[in-house]
Design a protein with these regions (language model features):
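Structural signal for the C-terminal ends of transmembrane alpha-helices
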Residues: 66-74, 138-146, 193-203, 260-269, ...
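Alpha-helical transmembrane segments of multi-pass integral membrane proteins
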Residues: 96, 229-343
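Juxtamembrane "helix-exit" motif on the non-cytosolic side of transmembrane helices
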Residues: 31-35, 99-106, 165-174, 222-238, ...
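Transmembrane alpha-helical segments and their boundary/interface "anchor" motifs
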Residues: 43-44, 50-61, 68-99, 103-132, ...
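Solvent-exposed interhelical
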Residues: 134-160, 196-215
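Interfacial loop-to-helix transition and helix-capping segments at the boundaries
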Residues: 45-57, 113-128, 169-190, 222-256, ...
Length: 369
């Protein structure tokens, strides 16, 4: 994407979102969220940080809705190839590391999962994003065909079915295909939300956005407290995860507020804007490196976030350092990967794939009248 078409505020949000994803994984996958006694001040502070960071994945997807919703034409096969190649590289890299470390046995099944990561759901986000990207021409046709009233109705129905119904009746998530937000169907809703904001030039004052983000996050923490009591009392396994899912209404409100807040931000310094534009495209690699199914448990066992027994101040200091280090290493590794990608002249292959796909589609569908 050319720099002049990129939004410095949104690209800053892309970087921040990835750091927040690492933070969220540290509290969840890394075990810090369960290190302190349940109900203690430290316990709830960790989960408040988790909820504040929960918007990150939604915002990351919404960026695609903003950038891609005005694109015309068929899906770009070259871009699909780029996504697939990057996921495959990190899948094989982390698989080799895991096998070498003894964390994963070398078997036909594990090798097949590594070789076909988008089909094995080794990276749930990558699989869902790939399917969403494949659907972009259809999603854009919907975006461009609806008037404002119809569009509002679409969003209202989608949120009622997926956010409200999918949370209150969490045991029925398979019927709504939302799976607590771990689904390409939920990504469609996020895409439509961001596309709506762009199509109708929705703007909200920054102060109000910040207030809505903090208020919705506070509501998310309260809902988690309540859901934890209900889950423990009634043995409703999975209720807490549904209440704090990506699709939960408070998470959606906080995500929209964060998105609209960064829409108002424009970096004026050429120096910092160049750095943001350099780092932001590497963010996806940070996720692929640190959250592979093959090495996730190994990584967080090595980091050992609960080493201080959940004690608040040392744990927060250690968490901050660990999150920043993981993010920095991830950005550095992906910078190397992107250079290797260019050295192998794979961007030229993307162009050829786009041209080939266009010819095939023209032969199948025919040209416009």
């Amino acid at each position: 994407m050319e720099e002049q078409k990129r939004h410095s505020g949104f690209e800053t949000m892309r970087i921040l979102s990835m750091v927040m994803i690492v933070l969220m994984h540290g509290i969840g996958h890394g075990g810090l969220g369960s290190a302190a006694p349940q109900g203690s001040a430290a316990f709830w502070i960790y989960w408040l940080l988790f909820i504040l960071a929960r918007v990150s994945t939604n915002c990351f997807v919404m960026l695609s809705g903003y950038y891609l919703s005005e694109r015309k034409g068929a899906v770009r096969a070259g871009r699909l190839f780029r996504i697939g190649a990057q996921v495959w590289f990190y899948s094989m890299l982390t698989f080799c590391v895991a096998v070498k470390a003894g964390a994963v046995p070398l078997s036909a099944i594990s090798l097949l999962r590594a070789l076909l990561p988008l089909t094995s759901n080794g990276y749930w986000f990558a699989s869902a994003y790939f399917l969403m990207y494949l659907s972009v021409p259809v999603l854009n046709a919907v975006v461009q065909s609806l008037d404002r009233r119809q569009y509002k109705t679409l969003l209202l129905v989608a949120l009622l079915l997926q956010s409200v119904w999918g949370t209150l009746f969490y045991w029925a998530t398979d019927e709504t295909f939302v799976n607590n937000g771990y689904s390409f169907i939920w990504f469609y809703t996020l895409y439509f939300m961001a596309a709506y904001f762009r199509k109708y030039r929705v703007t909200v004052p920054s102060g109000l956005c910040l207030l809505a983000y903090l208020a919705a996050s506070a509501a998310g923490l309260f809902n988690r407290m309540l859901a934890l009591r209900v889950e423990n009392a009634l043995h409703l396994n999975g209720f807490v995860n549904a209440v704090n899912g990506y699709q939960a209404l408070d998470t959606v409100i906080a995500s929209a507020a964060m998105f609209l807040l960064f829409q108002n931000i424009h970096i004026r310094s050429d120096y910092w804007r160049r750095w943001v534009f350099r780092l932001a495209p590497l963010s996806f690699g940070v996720y692929l490196l640190h959250d592979s199914d093959f090495t996730r448990a190994l990584l967080w066992r090595l980091v050992d976030l609960p080493r201080f027994g959940g004690a608040l101040l040392p744990s927060l200091a250690y968490l901050t350092g660990a999150v920043l280090l993981i993010a920095v290493v991830g950005y550095a590794v992906d910078a190397v990967y992107q250079r290797l990608y260019r050295l192998l002249h794979l961007p030229a292959l993307e162009t050829k794939l786009d041209a080939l796909t266009a010819r095939i589609l023209q032969n199948i569908v025919g040209s416009k009248e």
